[in-house]
Amino acid sequence: MKIKQVIREHRSIAILFGFELLVLIWAFCLLFGERTVIDINPENADYFNSCTINDGKLQINQSENEVGIDIVSAEYTNIKLKPGRYNIEAVYSAELEGFDAASWSGGNEMPICNIGVTSGTFIQQLVGSGFNIYTGTSYNSEPFWINSITSCKDLSLKVTYKGYGNITIEKLIISESVYFRYVRFFTIFFIFTLINIIVCILNNIIKTAFDKKIIIGIMAVTVFSSLPMIYRYLIVGHDLTFHIARIAEIAEGIKAGNWLIKIQPDMINGYGYATPLFYPQLFLYIPALLYVIGFPLHTSYQIFIVLINFGTCLISYVSLVKICKNKNLAFIGSFLYVLAPYRLSELYVAGRLGEILSMVFFPLIIYGIYNIYSEEKILTFKKCIPLILGVSGVMQSHLVSILFVGIFAIMYALFNLRKTFKPERLCYLAVSVLVVIMLNAWFIVPFIDSMDMDIMVNGDGILRFQGSGVYPIQMPALFYFGRGTNVPMLVSDEFCLSMGAALIIGIVVWLYAHYKSLNSEKRNESMFALGNITGIFAIMTIVFSLWIFPWDEINNISRTIAVWLAKVEFSWRFLSVGTAFAAFCTVSGLYYAKELNKKIYSYSIIAMAAFTIISAGFFYADLAFGSNAAQICYKNDVDDFALGITNDYQLADTDLDMCKNKQIDVTSDLLTVTSYSSVGGKTEIGVMNAGTEAFEKVIIPVFYYPGYKAYDSDTGEQFYIEAGANKKIMVNVPAGYNGKITVRYVEKSVWRLSEIVSPLTLSALVITACINNRKKTA
């Protein structure tokens, strides 16, 4: 359709395009102009309090200061800035009286003052507030954002003294991040393009296989499920800070040129944490890249959650429509799944990002298994692709969830033993497993190689999660709160651990349809069989999550099984995959109920839709009033001791309280430390061993995870390292040595090889898909 014809036939669309064009022209004009740099002279403050100016430097001394804590010492007002991203830069010297700087290598426990920005009129538009200045540092730079259309004319920069220590501020600079102008322009362009595509599809200007009603429905469900993310702040769930820290560490690795980090070097005050070896983080590169290009950290996370909700809705819909061939039923199933109480509660109250990511791919796995087992005549590798992608998606999201996939996949294979052992199907299943391993080798190989590491998660391996089970009274919950935690053996103050009233109704509908169709020809249909297996599995997951299921007895039956199941931690986690099973069996039940009794079919849909919306609405209202919220704009806002609830990847027998300060220790007075720096996982320490006979040892504030190497920075000569006090890295320095030693984490050669195998496998899959598509087109 030509542009003139579109304008003539769709005047409202033409007006929309015109408005978008004006906004794009405005954004384009903002690309040009000089970079804003404001060099603030410390002695030109508009307000002083208990501080002095000496040689053009702002000084605050503890011995001369009698004001209290958090008192504004200097303020620079009426700073004018255009919309954009800016950095506050400060050059200073900071110290505590009586503090031994020679033994300090950084750390973040003793802030002396805060440098921040405020505005009286742009309270909502100003994002980011500044940073603290700590002992042992001399420079800091942090961003802030002005998200507005017009300029901010009353920005204030404040220096707030914390009540102890001495600080001399030499330079204060506010500088614009010019590249963010381009980020802003292309973000607006992308949003407008997305809006225009949807508008054109809905008005038949662009043809698509998707039904217009379904497109509107998927967008509506995405928006409704993402309402808590359309917020100035982040709702702080149980594990949110842990996952935000993971994202920030990936971003810092990308900035340093290290894309595949295996140790998070800045966690635990720079001692390091081994999360990447044991917790998949492929999808976290999406928010990490958004943060790297200039978005605030919490905004990057919010965008990511919206994408997860959209992906969950789209993938579950496509998986269901491929099976049932009914768009309306597929959408109902997707709607119930995305807005399920357990999913929303895990997403916003618990903040369990890995579990939520795995729920994106459960429907794809169910469809993939259905695809392979329902086809009797023609079975091709193409039919294995959904299963391969689904399992890989879960594997790159959450390892506990892949354990659930394995458990129920084995059960399904045993229930269909005759079909499973047909040579052709068995061959394709084996090929699928092989491709999954090769596709994910870059994570699997380091994970398996590190499984015997002495970390907390490998503790005693005793299965003891029966007490975390759910009571039957909780399962059909209609109203659930947006707060709480898991309380063993109690219900009060618990967050939602429920399948929800809507999905319970769905299971009942399936039971009705199953019973009524037992003696008909329908029982031989693949759709009926799928409903049976997903219905049985849904009920099993409910039973598994209950406190009455005797999980703890497995300790006396099989030690091996107990050790593996102990990784699950909470029995109610079975509800994650159970929610997917319930959604699929609900669709199967509705599919047959429509033919059996239209009243039951209609009333069931109305009841499930109403219960889902009412439940979610009540949950959102309580979430807004009863939860904690925070702005986490940049890395310094992240708690580097956010290790997850159980500190799973902390080295065993280490004391985190001893990590609050970063102390360099030597085992002899003959050994002198001349310099120290630790940036991006690379530690460099200058040492001089005045001894002539024996090795001396220097202990650096970095945890000794297997894989660290120490070598001479100039010659590459390796030094022996071992675990010292509190399992810190202890480097053996030879007699007479005078130089600089580099300590960093080095991947094994087989790990590097696996990082080549995975992209090659992905490339082969893409090429195969393109060839098959070309053949089909021809």
What is each PLM-predicted segment?
Residues 20-22, 47-49, 314, 607-695, ...:
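Extracytoplasmic
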Residues 60-84, 138-145, 166-169, 673, ...:
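Short beta-strands within extracellular/lumenal beta-sheet-rich domains
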Residues 2-34, 175-625, 740-745, 750-778:
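Membrane-embedded transmembrane-helix bundle of lipid-linked glycan/lipid transferases
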Residues 75, 140-145, 179-181, 657-778:
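Active-site-proximal, structured, solvent-exposed surfaces of multi-pass membrane proteins
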Residues 62-81, 97-101, 112, 122-128:
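Secreted extracellular polysaccharide-interacting domains
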Residues 120-152:
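Extracellular carbohydrate recognition and processing domains
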Residues 42, 74-99, 172, 710:
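Extra-cytoplasmic beta-strand recognition segments
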Residues 157-165, 745-747:
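Short beta-strand-plus-loop segments that form exposed binding edges in beta-rich domains
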